[in-house]
Amino acid sequence: MKLERKFYDRPTLEVSKDLLGKKLVHYVKGEKLSARIVEVEAYIGAIDKAAHSYNNKITERTKIMFGPPGYAYVYLIYGMYHCMNIVTEKDGVAAAVLIRAVEPVNGIETMANYRYSKPIEDLTKKQIHNLTSGPGKLCVAMNISKINNGADLCGEEMWIEADGYHNFEIVTTKRINIDYAEEAIDFPWRFYIKDNPFISRK
């Protein structure tokens, strides 16, 4: 079942945890690529020095974070890796959830080709586990780029869906690679499914 707009129009920390176990779906050239969300991070601009929109700063890049909820915020890091975020909370609130890692469900053969340019049967066990175990990796594997920035996640090309998967334990911890964020370094705003092999790190 595709998630409706009201799912995203809630406090970001609630949405973050509730996204775990849901499936990210992207239709690419007529093929359905889907993967279960296993790791996320929350970013809340008003108080979060790790957020692009800290102190409610609006720029051409961050304006999508200010709403409305349920849209994709995709940006480039290090000049080469894309990161997929989901805008949350009511219109005017700068907040989003970063999808840090996913577990492939549909289209893994195509994901392997996008990620490694070779068929799934030629991948090592380590390569398979690294297929989507990071924000940049999952964007390559699922063919997500800046073209998808601003995509309506209640639309027909990309969305999040629920399939009743909920038998897991959530781990709460600090976020990763935000050494510049001062006190926000210690915010426990990273959530992942315990013991899932596709998480980026424990």
Curated annotation (Swiss-Prot):
InterPro entries reported for this sequence: Formyl_transferase-like_C_sf, MPG, MPG_sf
Broad class of enzyme this protein falls into? hydrolase
Keyword DNA repair attached: yes
Biological process (GO) annotations held by this record are: base-excision repair
Enzyme Commission code(s) on record? 3.2.2.-
Domain of life of the organism encoding this protein: Bacteria
Family annotation (Pfam families): Pur_DNA_glyco (PF02245)
Entry keyword set = DNA damage, DNA repair, Hydrolase
Keyword Hydrolase attached: yes
Q: Which GO terms describe its molecular function?
A: alkylbase DNA N-glycosylase activity; DNA binding
The similarity comment for this entry is: Belongs to the DNA glycosylase MPG family.
Listed name of the protein? Putative 3-methyladenine DNA glycosylase
What organism, scientifically named, is this protein from? Answer: Alkaliphilus oremlandii (strain OhILAs) (Clostridium oremlandii (strain OhILAs))
